Amino acid sequence: MPLDGVKNIVLVLSGKGGVGKSSVTLQLALALSLQGKSVGILDIDLTGPSIPRLVGLEDAKITQAPGGWIPVPVHTAQNPSSTTQPRGSLRCMSLGFLLRDRGDAVIWRGPKKTAMIRQFLSDVYWGPTDYLLVDTPPGTSDEHIALAEQLLTLASTDPSATAAGLSRLAGAVLVTTPQAIATSDVRKEANFCVKTKIPVLGVIENMSGYSCPCCGEVSNLFSSGGGKVMADELGIKFLGSVPVDVKFGELVEGKVVDDSDSDEEEGATQAQQQEEPVDDRPLVERYKDCWSHSRFEEFAKTLISQIEGASPASG
């Protein structure tokens, strides 16, 4: 059965490209995993799949099993101990894993995109998964319509769905940046959710200033507060804002995240020139060194409270 074992489905939407929707999807997934939840990421941005690059698994390949395609594992679950917190597993599925060459352009018409999305929703074996995050392309295109139609036939928006053993379309998280041009496009995305009867869980304002890696002071690169103003006007929950995190950028670029004090920066730079350090920890553990981890930890806790607090199965 499609989506068998998936409890909650959360769409990550943006009305405009370049707002960091895929990075928000990944950080939400990592934060939910660090709350002990098993998480999957379904990347349906068919013409610009970013998830394989962000998780550092561009060369991974999808395997076929009797139950369907097997998602690529990013990290496994970890049981709690006296020194560690519980950690859920993270797996991902993307068209990027199916391309023969990662530089291949995907030039498809609407019907082929629609068929691919339906196949992703019906032929991927996720197994037991607490949260499936769907990274969507920007705007409201054929992909969004196909996704909404298919999900509303495979899952229910009823909070009691998980108690009945069904997948629940919990809702959508909208991602914007502070500028008016971005928030105006996200308003259209919110309208799309209303028309398709998909609940909106909240708004995240990404790139809300620049966080200095030395002192932590946040400077506004663009205008500020646009996401919150829009959320208030639309009556949508504002989850919070996230400044640009240089350390997260280094993390997804495969560099070692340096959380040392700024006074040691010069010496560390000289040492790195002599010998490039290697960090063998899983991505999720290295993410803890990023400034944005604490912010997304709060987002994850809020979403869990919203979604599971509304479900009879949560007790």
UniProtKB/Swiss-Prot annotation:
GO terms for molecular function: 4 iron, 4 sulfur cluster binding; ATP binding; ATP hydrolysis activity; ATP-dependent FeS chaperone activity; metal ion binding. The keyword Iron-sulfur applies. Residues 256-283 are annotated as: Disordered. [4Fe-4S] cluster binds at residues 212, 215. It is found in: Cytoplasm. InterPro entries: Mrp/NBP35_ATP-bd, NUBP2/Cfd1_eukaryotes, P-loop_NTPase, YlxH/NBP35. Binds 4 [4Fe-4S] clusters per heterotetramer. Contains two stable clusters in the N-termini of nbp35 and two labile, bridging clusters between subunits of the nbp35-cfd1 heterotetramer. Keywords: 4Fe-4S, ATP-binding, Cytoplasm, Iron, Iron-sulfur, Metal-binding, Nucleotide-binding. Its main location: cytoplasm. Its cofactor is [4Fe-4S] cluster. GO terms for cellular component: cytosolic [4Fe-4S] assembly scaffold complex. GO terms for biological process: iron-sulfur cluster assembly; tRNA wobble uridine modification. The keyword Iron applies. It holds the Pfam family ParA. ATP binds at residues 15-22. Heterotetramer of 2 nbp35 and 2 cfd1 chains. Belongs to the Mrp/NBP35 ATP-binding proteins family. NUBP2/CFD1 subfamily. Component of the cytosolic iron-sulfur (Fe/S) protein assembly (CIA) machinery. Required for maturation of extramitochondrial Fe-S proteins. The nbp35-cfd1 heterotetramer forms a Fe-S scaffold complex, mediating the de novo assembly of an Fe-S cluster and its transfer to target apoproteins. PANTHER family: CYTOSOLIC FE-S CLUSTER ASSEMBLY FACTOR NUBP2, NUCLEOTIDE-BINDING PROTEIN NBP35 YEAST -RELATED. This is Cytosolic Fe-S cluster assembly factor cfd1. It comes from Aspergillus clavatus (strain ATCC 1007 / CBS 513.65 / DSM 816 / NCTC 3887 / NRRL 1 / QM 1276 / 107). The lineage of its organism: Eukaryota, Fungi, Dikarya, Ascomycota, Pezizomycotina. The gene is cfd1.
